[in-house]
């Protein structure tokens, strides 16, 4: 079982929205100080607009024309003196840390598929709704399958979990978590991140080790093994008797075949869940 140590990559995150105040500045004054919302709404900084250049607190100077070109669909981070777009193409997959609102946490998009619900809510609200389904977590030991950006593991700790073990298969996903200010809570000592295939990792866990299990996998077409009877059997084995499982399968209204939900329910019942 491979332990992953989370380390946040320092640097301000900018979006098209966060620099709108700068873009709107008219150069009436030779120099103007502008307050900018950064880190997807978590922080504010002051920058100096000097003609056609913008000077950030660390002294980095960026042309105003370049800031004007930032796309609403991307996030950018000031890392080691340069502004880097937060996307990646790796091993046939395209990853993007996607802004969804001016002051809301981002979602992770993989090959065009968002990892959170963003219609009439933001990724954090989506997470809170799901985690709340587990009920009170104070003092409990929680297994969190599919770390993603870490929002669910962070929310579980905020709800009082004594310890959270969260499992993520894709190192690129954890890389984007290291760039995301909203994921910084993953450095909490109560959270243990395991890098590995959940199918194999669960086999190494003790029986009846967890008070609650949070299972929010990618859609079935991307990770069918996480919906299998065999995997559900492992979830049942590691969950204490009387413990609670939350399993998100997507919005039922979006399933063209209701038999999918019925199949999930049947397999869960077959391994012992009620």
Regions found by a protein language model. Name each.
Residues 121-139:
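Conserved alpha-helix/loop element of class I SAM-dependent methyltransferases that forms part
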Residues 257-274:
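Conserved Class I S-adenosyl-L-methionine
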Residues 137-148:
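Conserved class I S-adenosyl-L-methionine
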Residues 167-206:
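S-adenosyl-L-methionine
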Residues 149-161:
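Conserved SAM-binding loop of SAM-dependent methyltransferases across substrates and taxa
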Residues 227-241:
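A short glycine-rich, Lys/Arg-flanked "PGG" loop and its adjoining helix->strand segment in the class I
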Residues 242-250:
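Conserved beta-strand signature within the Rossmann-like core of class I S-adenosyl-L-methionine
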Residues 2-101:
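N-terminal auxiliary segments of SAM/dcSAM-dependent transferases
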């Amino acid at each position: 079982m491979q332990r992953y140590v989370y380390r946040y990559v320092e640097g301000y995150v900018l979006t098209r929205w966060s620099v709108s105040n700068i873009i709107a500045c008219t150069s009436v004054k030779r120099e103007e100080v502008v307050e900018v919302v950064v880190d997807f709404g978590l922080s504010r900084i002051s920058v100096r607009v000097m003609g056609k250049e913008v000077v950030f607190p660390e002294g980095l100077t960026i042309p105003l024309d370049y800031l004007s070109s930032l796309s609403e669909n991307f996030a950018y981070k000031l890392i080691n003196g340069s502004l880097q777009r937060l996307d990646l193409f790796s091993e046939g997959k395209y990853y993007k840390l996607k802004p969804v609102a001016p002051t809301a946490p981002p979602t992770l998009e993989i090959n065009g598929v968002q990892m959170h619900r963003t219609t009439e809510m933001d990724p954090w609200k989506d997470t809170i709704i799901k985690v709340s389904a587990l009920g009170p977590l104070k003092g409990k030991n929680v297994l969190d399958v599919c770390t993603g950006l870490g929002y669910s593991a962070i929310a579980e700790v905020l709800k009082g979990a004594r310890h959270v073990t969260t499992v993520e298969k894709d190192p690129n996903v954890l890389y984007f978590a290291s760039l995301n200010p909203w994921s910084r809570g993953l450095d909490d000592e109560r959270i243990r991140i395991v890098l590995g295939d959940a199918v194999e990792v669960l086999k190494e866990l003790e029986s009846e080790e967890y008070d609650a299990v949070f299972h929010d996998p990618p859609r079935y077409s991307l990770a069918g093994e996480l919906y299998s009877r065999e995997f559900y059997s492992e979830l049942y084995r590691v969950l204490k008797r009387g413990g609670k499982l939350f399993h998100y399968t997507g919005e039922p209204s979006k399933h063209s075949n209701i038999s999918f939900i019925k199949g999930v329910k049947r397999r869960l019942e077959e391994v012992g869940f009620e």
